[in-house]
Design a protein with these regions (language model features):
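Active-site phosphate-binding strand-loop segment of PLP-dependent enzymes
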Residues: 93-153
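Conserved PLP-anchoring active-site segment centered on the Schiff-base-forming lysine
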Residues: 53-69
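Conserved PLP-binding catalytic core of the aspartate aminotransferase-like
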Residues: 269-304
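Active-site C-terminal subdomain of aminotransferase-like
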Residues: 172-262, 370
Length: 370
């Protein structure tokens, strides 16, 4: 990223962009169009909405945390009618509940479903394949739109095979690039709906960005240094191999869960997500009993050890913390983080089972033999 800017109209920048758009197809696992935006995840949410919806369209939001709800709030501000299929911060979306709601919508009034594959507030992972299967089984024409900000590049995502219509992500998590880039992918079905969408705006518009001139790909000057960084990050991912990347995330997530499982024996802290199969491989949300103050633990880890834990969000705010294990991360980083948390629990006399970090080490030692 520490390099001079180059000509944005011809030469290496053009071929670089072409390579990125093609490699984003590999990441989303789609033959559909891919788009690069100078934006964060919230920006690319808006890109997705404005390219396929019109004012007054009805949107169904699948609740499993905070971020699909935020996406729905954005749709409401754009003039859409928003309905929330109520869920829980502690469990995944139930595909059968989605199907039941769509079966009640005989006139296909619901135009889009908004769902997060992983909600970073709750730590819930949703089974997008099962949700898509449930939707298609109803025969409903609704578009399935997926927030993959906290999942793409960390776990399987099969856009075409599963039947996802629109998917979005950002640069700063699994794609290992500083914040500032957003990405969208669109199925042929979504592109057909796009042609009659009433919320289209010049900057986000897919048709404009498919223009022949390189200028069109970014609707102006590209954020070149971020684009250079993305190229390097994708090269790292493909060198490691996507299957190996996914395995690394599974192992480090399970090591984290082994530690928390031991700490939970003290009955003061534990997992937010109740079902083990619904706990994500990119972030783990930890909740504490009501009388336990978690801020001193967060402060201790940051101020004494330089480890920044994610604060709890949404309905969990002030009630816990989050440990991320996604993107450019390895065993020493995770084990070090777990060790610091365990130190903090001991220093602050927060009841916990002893040996959580050791349990994580033991798990990894068996999972990754010599």
């Amino acid at each position: 990223m520490h390099r001079p800017a180059v000509d944005i109209y011809s030469g290496p920048m053009v071929s670089l962009t072409d390579s990125l758009l093609a490699d984003l197809q590999k990441m989303f696992r789609t033959k559909g169009g891919t788009y690069i935006y100078a934006a964060n995840g919230h920006g690319v949410w808006e890109a997705a909405l404005t390219n396929v919806l019109s004012r007054g369209d009805k949107v169904l939001v699948l609740e499993s945390g905070r971020f699909a709800i935020h996406w729905g709030e954005q749709a409401k501000m754009l003039g859409c009618e928003v309905e929330v299929l109520e869920g829980d911060f502690r469990c995944a979306v139930r595909p059968e509940a989605v199907a039941a709601r769509l079966k009640q919508d005989g006139k296909n009034a619901i135009k889009a479903i908004l769902v997060a594959q992983i909600d970073t507030a709750s730590g819930v992972v949703n089974d997008i394949e099962a949700v898509c299967e449930a939707v298609r089984a109803t025969g409903h024409e609704v578009l399935v739109m997926v927030d993959a900000v906290a999942s793409l590049g960390c776990m399987p995502f099969e856009m075409d095979a599963w039947g996802v219509d629109v998917a979005i992500t950002g640069s700063q998590k699994g794609l290992m690039t500083p914040p500032g880039l957003g990405f969208a992918a669109a199925s042929p079905r979504a592109r057909a709906v796009h042609n009659k969408a009433g919320l289209r705006t010049p900057y986000w518009d897919w048709t404009f960005r498919e223009g022949e001139a390189h200028y069109h790909k970014y609707c102006g000057t590209p954020p070149q240094q971020l684009v250079f960084g993305l190229r390097a990050a994708l090269d790292m991912i493909f060198t490691e191999g996507l299957d190996n990347v996914f395995r690394r995330h599974r192992l480090l997530a399970e090591a984290t869960r082994r530690a928390i499982g031991v700490w939970a024996e003290g009955q003061a802290i534990g997992f937010n997500v109740t079902e083990p199969a619904e706990r994500s491989d990119t972030v783990t949300a930890v909740v504490a009993r009501e009388e336990i103050r978690v801020q001193p633990l967060i402060d201790y880890c940051a101020n004494q050890c330089g480890v920044v834990l994610g604060r709890a969000l949404g309905t969990l705010e002030g009630k816990g913390f989050r440990i991320a294990h996604m993107g450019h991360i390895n065993a020493p980083m995770v084990i070090g983080t777990l060790g610091v948390v365990e130190m903090g629990l001991s220093v602050l006399n927060i009841p916990h089972g002893k040996g959580g970090t050791a349990a994580a080490i033991d798990y990894l030692a068996k999972a990754v033999p010599a």
